[in-house]
Amino acid sequence: MKATEVIEKLKAKFPGQPEYIQAVSQVLGTIEEEYNKHPEFEKANLIERLCVPDRILQFRVSWVDDNGNVQTNLGYRVQHNNAIGPYKGGLRFHKSVNASILKFLAFEQTFKNSLTTLPMGGAKGGSDFDPHGKSDMEVMRFCQAFMNELYRLIGPDEDVPAGDIGVGGREVGYMFGQYKKLTHQFQGILTGKGLEFGGSLIRPEATGYGNVYFLEDMLKTRGESLEGKTVLVSGSGNVAQYTIEKLLQLGAKPVTCSDSNGYIYDPDGIDAEKLAFIMELKNVKRGRIKEYAEKYGVKYVENARPWGEKADIATPCATQDEINEAEAKTLIANGVFAVSEGANMPTEPAAIKVFQDAKILYCPGKASNAGGVATSGLEMSQNSERLSWTREEVDTKLHNIMDEIHANCVKYGTEPDGYINYVKGANVAGFMKVAKAMMAQGIY
């Protein structure tokens, strides 16, 4: 396989889908060497089969707003690959949703799910419906109308959606209720459910906890630990909050937190009491992080990100493309030797190159934030067993999964000079499991 030739063919076949082409390009560039060690893959034209989704489903969603007007949105489900398990991936409700974005996300989800070591294929779906500014009743009516179409395409052994941007516990609950009404069946057809009807303990904490477990494993490769390390954390939502919580439990000192207006720097560290304030501020009061600075008398920098502060470790947990090339150089100059992504794709490609050229520890979110989808998989297991595991059981299983993801990244990402390229390791590890399953199942 020549990655460039495959990409050119896909560009011609799927014009006007830049997000999808970019995602495929990034993965193919890192797996090309390993792929070419297996001539049987090329004979089966495996890479083209893997790059094209099994199916893309598009449907109309009509619903009535509070003024009695009929609204129409587009709904999608991209079922990318089910070689290792039922299709699994979130539903996104956002005005930017289109086929290209969902194809890109489903492609990425296939490898991310493979990395978790759990039997889950890859999918993604959603709608161009925007829940912001809508009443609860409007959101409920839309979710019910959306499920009126989606229910035909999903099932516990076929396709199990979850939440994503614009789809939280409220939306999952509305869709689950409608599925139950339509089918007269109580099944684990969605994850991210409430604890009262089949949800899992640790699910809210999972992405943040898993991020720190992976970070801990990375540090061990250099004889280091989290004890006493100063950590820069961006964001102040779910992932950032539970990243900070687990950092504290393992002896680290998180010193920053941010939102879209700016960041706070607390040289004494964000302790358990201060974290409780952040959780109350963000989850209940919906306030701004500036209020933390006002309460505790620490530095607040408006319209900036925390990457200019001195620290040992950085973990971006806010949003896409939040570390650029210049910020990456600043982080290294200020003593940062490890970066673990809590958010999805928060580091720009040029910044990743800076980290790798400097030989610091860097892991992409595909591996380090896989704890969320891993715990969704554990929710599926509990639903199948008709059991609910304890908090300790789920946390132990999550920790073991993150350890195994790290081991696979090391296996496939270790360079001849001993440096661990976690980007390559994550992509190759995820790819190889899916590729071997596809080969075993024949041409279909």
Swiss-Prot record:
Reaction(s) the record says it catalyses: L-glutamate + NAD(+) + H2O = 2-oxoglutarate + NH4(+) + NADH + H(+); L-glutamate + NADP(+) + H2O = 2-oxoglutarate + NH4(+) + NADPH + H(+)
GO biological process terms on file: glutamate biosynthetic process
Site (Important for catalysis): D164
Pfam family, one: ELFV_dehydrog
EC code: 1.4.1.3
Cellular component, GO annotation: cytoplasm; cytosol
Keyword NADP: yes
Molecular functions (GO terms): glutamate dehydrogenase (NAD+) activity; glutamate dehydrogenase (NADP+) activity; glutamate dehydrogenase [NAD(P)+] activity
Binding site for NADP(+): T207, N238
Binding annotation for substrate: K88, Q109, K112, G163, S376
Keywords carried by this UniProt record: NAD, NADP, Oxidoreductase
Domain of life: Bacteria
Catalytic residues as annotated in Swiss-Prot or TrEMBL: K124 (proton donor)
Gene3D superfamilies in alphabetical order: Glutamate Dehydrogenase, chain A, domain 3, Leucine Dehydrogenase, chain A, domain 1, NAD(P)-binding Rossmann-like Domain
Cross-referenced InterPro entries: Aminoacid_DH-like_N_sf, Glu/Leu/Phe/Val/Trp_DH, Glu/Leu/Phe/Val/Trp_DH_C, Glu/Leu/Phe/Val/Trp_DH_dimer, Glu/Leu/Phe/Val_DH_AS, Glu_DH, Glu_Leu_Phe_Val_DH, NAD(P)-bd_dom_sf
Record's function text: Catalyzes the reversible oxidative deamination of glutamate to alpha-ketoglutarate and ammonia. P.ruminicola possess both NADP(H)- and NAD(H)-dependent activities on the same enzyme, suggesting that both anabolic and catabolic forms of the enzyme might occur.
NCBIfam families linked to this entry: PRK09414.1 (NF006929), PRK14031.1 (NF010634)
Complex and partners: Homohexamer.
Family from the record: Belongs to the Glu/Leu/Phe/Val dehydrogenases family.
Protein name per its UniProtKB record: NAD(P)-specific glutamate dehydrogenase
UniProt organism field: Xylanibacter ruminicola (Prevotella ruminicola)
